[in-house]
């Protein structure tokens, strides 16, 4: 049996983790296997995101440079800091 009372557990809520990633590069995976990379500028409670210097990726390679984009939160599969 593990005694968890002596262990520190660092648990973050999803929006807290996003807040920690503001003004940092992130990779966003969307439904339909689309992937974007850019600097996270803002987000809201629905996890809608604004990325600056956004690029669309395919197999890890840049296919398009998009500039500033808004990504709807419903389409996001994961966000990687």
UniProtKB/Swiss-Prot annotation:
Domain Sm: 13-81
NCBIfam families per UniProt: PRK00737.1
Annotated Gene Ontology cellular component terms: ribonucleoprotein complex; Sm-like protein family complex
Entry similarity comment: Belongs to the snRNP Sm proteins family.
Gene Ontology process terms (BP): mRNA splicing, via spliceosome
Keyword Oxidoreductase: no
This protein's UniProt keywords: Ribonucleoprotein
One of the Pfam families matching this protein, by short name: LSM
Protein name per Swiss-Prot or TrEMBL: Putative snRNP Sm-like protein
Lineage: superkingdom: Archaea
A molecular-function term among this protein's GO annotations: RNA binding
């Amino acid at each position: 049996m593990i005694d968890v009372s002596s262990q520190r557990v660092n648990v973050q809520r999803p929006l807290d983790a996003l807040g920690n990633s503001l003004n940092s590069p992130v990779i966003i995976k969307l439904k339909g296997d689309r992937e974007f990379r850019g600097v996270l500028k803002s987000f809201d409670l629905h996890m809608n995101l604004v990325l600056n210097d956004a690029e669309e990726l395919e197999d890890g390679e840049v296919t398009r440079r998009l500039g500033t984009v808004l990504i709807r939160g419903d389409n996001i599969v994961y966000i990687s800091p």
